[in-house]
Regions:
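DNA-contacting interfaces and partner/effector-binding or oligomerization modules
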Residues: 61, 67-164
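N-terminal low-complexity or simple alpha-helical regulatory segments
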Residues: 1-84, 102
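Generic solvent-exposed, charged/amphipathic alpha-helical segments
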Residues: 52, 56, 107-111, 115, ...
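Short hinge/gating elements
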Residues: 36-41, 92-97, 184
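A short, terminal or domain-edge coil/loop segment
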Residues: 41-55, 80-87, 124-136, 171-191
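Extended mid-to-C-terminal alpha-helical interaction segments
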Residues: 133-137, 141-226
Length: 226
């Protein structure tokens, strides 16, 4: 299933269920293995710190609309999810609904996965989103997780004391094997992205050649790039 087909499926599910917070439930119920090699690497890694570094490095193999970043202060571990490409499907309302679904499913999915190391991690979590509050959040079981609205960045934080929390199912051999598959997936993605970018630039040059070649900044603007 292509990314576009999956996006249409999500929008239809949101419409049919009339549940704009479906992303939260989806994230809580998703299994790590649904993320392929990255999920298997996550399940076999040594501790929370390794899991966070792993996801930051190979997140792009699962979805390219966002990029994760994490850092630590004196008290908390912060995990942020920043926009890379705009989420668009249909009109502005559908696009916003899809974006909210993706962000919520990724944030709450990450919290759900980290709970495999310790169930207490979720209890200390606070989620940050960049949109306004909505009454329908009251109908969702947030598992004691607090949500902060109108924030500058989307993400979540949890107590620093869990950084070195061990994985009881850690398996170094399985982890290294999964990493090889992750590297292979990332290499394929880079090759495909380079090939697609070359095609897109070539198309822009050919399409507008009769009016003179566009500048590089103009091509970047048309391709939604910097």
């Amino acid at each position: 299933m292509s990314a576009h087909q999956w996006s249409k499926l999500v929008v239809n599910a949101l419409r049919l269920t009339r549940n704009p917070r479906l992303g939260i439930e989806y994230g809580f119920r998703l299994r790590p293995t649904s993320h392929g090699a990255l999920g298997f690497a996550f399940l076999s890694c040594a501790d929370v710190e390794t899991a966070l570094s792993l996801c930051q490095q190979y997140f792009c193999t699962r979805i390219q609309n966002f990029t994760p970043e994490w850092h630590i202060d004196e008290t908390f571990i912060y995990v942020y999810l920043d926009d890379v490409h705009p989420v668009k499907l249909g009109d502005a309302e559908q696009s916003d609904q899809l974006r909210h679904f993706l962000i919520e499913s990724l944030l709450f999915g990450a919290i759900h996965f980290l709970s495999l190391f310790s169930e207490k991690i979720a209890e200390s979590c606070e989620v940050f989103v960049d949109w306004t509050d909505a009454q329908n959040y009251k109908s969702v079981d947030l598992a004691q997780i607090t949500i902060h609205f109108n924030q500058a960045r989307n993400g979540f934080r949890f107590s620093k004391k869990y950084l070195h929390c061990k994985n009881s199912n850690a398996d170094q051999v399985a982890f290294q094997q999964a990493i090889l598959y992750c590297e292979n997936d990332k290499l394929k993605l880079v090759k495909e992205s380079t090939r697609d970018l070359q095609k897109s630039i070539r198309s822009e040059l050919l399409y507008h050649s009769s009016h003179g070649y566009p500048s590089l900044p103009l091509i970047a603007q048309r391709l939604n790039m910097s």
